[in-house]
Amino acid sequence: MVGEFLKREREALGLTQRDIAERTNLMRQLVDELEREDFHRVAAVIYGRGFIKLYGEALGLAPEKIALLQQDFSTIYNGLSQSPIKIKKEEKPL
């Protein structure tokens, strides 16, 4: 998921959460919450997408990868982490 990916990339670069906080001007606690996918501080999906963008840029990720992470974030934030279920229309009796 989004948080796990960001954490793995950060650790692979030898960076701490504090390093990311300093590079993005986000609170370190928010960086931790993003990595744990604890989005209770995120007031709206647009803010979360912005946080993901800042974090991705701090890691040097390609814009395309950041866009994919933002999409994944939106899905999680909106509670749609599973594929939508298709409901069949009831057939009317003859």
Indicate residue ranges for each PLM-predicted region:
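Residues in soluble alpha-helical coiled-coils and helical-bundle/repeat scaffolds
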Residues: 39, 47, 60-64
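Recognition helix of helix-turn-helix/homeodomain-like DNA-binding domains
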Residues: 28-45
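Short acidic alpha-helix initiation/capping motifs at coil-to-helix transition points
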Residues: 10-11, 44-48
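Low-complexity alpha-helical segments at protein termini and membrane interfaces
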Residues: 1-8, 12, 16-19, 29, ...
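Hydrophobic micro-packing sites on short alpha-helices
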Residues: 51, 55-56
